[in-house]
Amino acid sequence: MTLNFEDFQKQDIRFDINELQKAYREIIKIKNFDGPEGISNFGAISLTQIPGNPDSIKGHKARGVFWTYPDSSGKEQIRDEKINEAAYSEFIEDYKNTYFKEVFDVLSSKYKLGRVRILLKQPRSTLSWHRDPEPRLHIPIITNPGCHMVIDNVAKHLPADGSVWITNNTKYHNAFNGGEENRIHLVACVLDHKFN
């Protein structure tokens, strides 16, 4: 059997991994991970918001809409709130002096972005099997060999080396961290990237 990795597209951009990790350490000194109340397996620090609207990054808006098969009925169900991704164009003032602002500026010049977030996957945890409305751009910041993303039953480890990936999150997928340290990725919604 030959595995097809076409849903994991490495981009022709690379950032300085040491600067990414430094920026992450700077941000967690001033901001904790947020998520919807009662959801223990999700944490986000939003780097962008709807201009002038700090409430646009709180609660379920940190996560956004997705579809899942939650039980044995096999019926797909929608979860969380629909997000107007294109409205999330303002880089949050508190983080403008970090390397993430440079990363945002470079990415924004190449892609039409929605929300840009730092996402946490805690040790020995996983997401649900779900699909999203659009592809995602990933820049792994901290990872370990036990971290994998699975798209349509194909698993891939994305190394923390400054590489930029676009993943086809419109297909069913999940991410898991089988290691014993946090997995940290910069994740952006990409509104103008099409997979075949």
What name fits each language-model region?
Residues 1-103:
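Non-heme Fe(II)/2-oxoglutarate
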Residues 8-10, 134-136, 185:
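Intrinsic-disorder/low-complexity, polar/charged segments enriched in Ser/Thr/Lys/Arg/Asp/Glu/Gln
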Residues 102-123:
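A short glycine-rich, His/Asp/Glu-containing loop-to-beta-strand
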Residues 114, 133-135, 182:
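Residues that flank catalytic or metal-binding motifs in active/ligand-binding sites
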Residues 120, 131-147:
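Short, conserved beta-strand element in jelly-roll/cupin
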Residues 127-130, 147-149, 158, 167-179:
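Short beta-strand His + acidic residue motifs that chelate non-heme Fe in jelly-roll/DSBH
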Residues 137-140, 164-166, 180-196:
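A short hydrophobic beta-strand segment most commonly corresponding to one strand
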Residues 140-160:
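A short beta-strand-loop-beta hairpin characteristic of the jelly-roll/cupin
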